[in-house]
Amino acid sequence: MALNPEDLGSGFRHSKVSMFINEQMAKHDKGPDFYLENLSLSWEEVEDKFKVILEDSEVSNEAREACAWGTLALGVRFAHRQGCLQGHGVQWLQDLSSLHKMSALSLSPDLKQLIHQQEMAQKEVALQLQMAQAKLEEVQRERDLLRLKILQAELRALPNAVRPAVAIPPAVVRRGGIRTQWSSTKENLAEWMAAATGRPNERANMSDTALSGTITSPEEVLEDPNGSFMKLLGVMKCKNYPLKRQRLDLRPKKASMCSFSQSLNLRSTVSSEPFIVQLPASFTYSYESPFPAIPTTSQLPTTERQPHVYPYSMASDISHLSDMRIHRGDHQELPKDKRFSAFRRPGDWDCPWCKAVNFSRRENCFHCGKGIWLQNP
């Protein structure tokens, strides 16, 4: 019997089917032999051999039928074997997939731990960077403070000989407390001139060249009471610094005398000569005078000039002038009959609160900032 019914690899599940195929192959001796010889071959090779038998005319029909049943049994056997192989392959793939899943599940905690460690490291680095930036800012602030202290120490270390002095009239010198305020006035004037030129490191040289021989101390003024106040301060050639709301035609074309006699805080009778200061040629910063211009005696055509913003810090300049007791607010200490009426124009008004003189075109007081409209309820 060529086909064993108990053989599970034959591909037949029922024994009757196996027995019937064996009977059909047994009708000719070549049938069982064809089945047993080709068990180890592939289906392509078996098909090629059966084709040769069919083409051979010497083979009888019974032999052909027996070989055909053997070929059928071999085909079923090959199909069953191929199915088993595919089933084993699928099972292997399933096992491999489950193995990969188990590996992924086992590696997931490790991956999470690594991600957490990386995030912690990034946060630590960011914190260190922030701390470094904070330390850098603190060091920069300390550096700036040290520079400021060094600059202040250098300014304090300058000798008194290079600090400028301002001469005032004997009548002002005789006022109470003027000698105690004179040292601060000299230092403020020197710092003002140094800041205006933009060269604070050259304050000593500028003070020597600008004020040597032209500005004297109050003691020298007292020793020579007959001397002129103009001669002590010298003559300054103005470089046509622009004045706020000043008429263009009223500006002198040549070097003029800059008068500060209206804003001097003089409680006693002073000379009618103007307050004149001589500055060096290097003193070229743009400064706008806060005092009104002196009108000339000749009638010139009036042309209004548009107001403009101060190009320099007027707050610091006025503060220095106030330290030197050169401020418009000091006019309130003078009697009305002793004010210089030559500096008033038709329409100028006095502030009812601070008594400062303002131009007719101003609506608010330049000194206290209150409006003229507050006078009328």
UniProtKB/Swiss-Prot annotation:
Keywords for this protein: Coiled coil, Leucine-rich repeat, Metal-binding, RNA-binding, Transcription, Transcription regulation, Zinc, Zinc-finger
Keyword Transport in record: no
Keyword Metal-binding in annotation: yes
Disrupted-gene phenotype: Mice are fertile with no visible testis phenotype. Mature sperm show a decrease in rapid motility, which includes a decrease in path velocity, track seed, and rapid progression, as well as a decrease in overall sperm concentration. Decrease in mRNA levels of ribosomal components and increase in structural components of the sperm head and tail.
Start-end of RanBP2-type zinc fingers: 345-369
Spans of repeat LRR: 142-165
Sequence segments annotated as region (Required for repression of transcription): 92-377
Matching InterPro entries: TEX13A-D_N, TEX13A/C/D_Znf, Znf_RanBP2, Znf_RanBP2_sf
PROSITE patterns xrefs: ZF_RANBP2_1, ZF_RANBP2_2
Coiled-coil ranges (or none): 122-156
Binding site for Zn(2+): 351, 354, 365, 368
A molecular function GO annotation: zinc ion binding
Pfam families assigned: TEX13, Zn_ribbon_TEX13
Quaternary structure, from the entry: Interacts with CNOT1; the interaction may inhibit CNOT1 binding to mRNA and subsequently CNOT1-mediated mRNA degradation.
Family from the record: Belongs to the TEX13 family.
Chain's role: Binds to ssRNA containing the consensus sequence 5'-AGGUAA-3'. Plays a role in transcriptional repression. Required for rapid sperm motility and timely degradation of mRNA via its interaction with CNOT1.
Protein's UniProt name: Testis-expressed protein 13A
Species of provenance: Mus musculus (Mouse)
Source species taxonomy: Eukaryota, Metazoa, Chordata, Craniata, Vertebrata
Gene designation: Tex13a
